């Protein structure tokens, strides 16, 4: 990387420096998140959290804040519907802004988990309309049945 070469050459004290880590340490990939009915935690991610309102599963994969856990163990956590539901009628959130703490965000901000939450939000929205319910009061069992029918693992 050119920046490292320049630092070594031009900045006193950097002559023998080495790059050990980068953006994942700084946390610059963090983003705004909602405050949902449930706030997913790092413990949920790392200790295989299970939820009655699960709308999908995701492998134990954390990439950020100087932590790297690759999905090679077969371990997974469930994504609860509550982390998609803010305190606003008929609004669902999917992707990197679901409700969660800093560590859980390092697991849920990637594209695979965005797909899981996006499918769940779409199914829940459609069912809430059919049932004449708000997304906050949708029949979660019906949502789960439809997700399974579509081939999702919950």
Explain the meaning of each model-derived region.
Residues 1-154:
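Flavin (FAD/FMN)-binding glycine-rich loop and adjacent Rossmann-like elements that form
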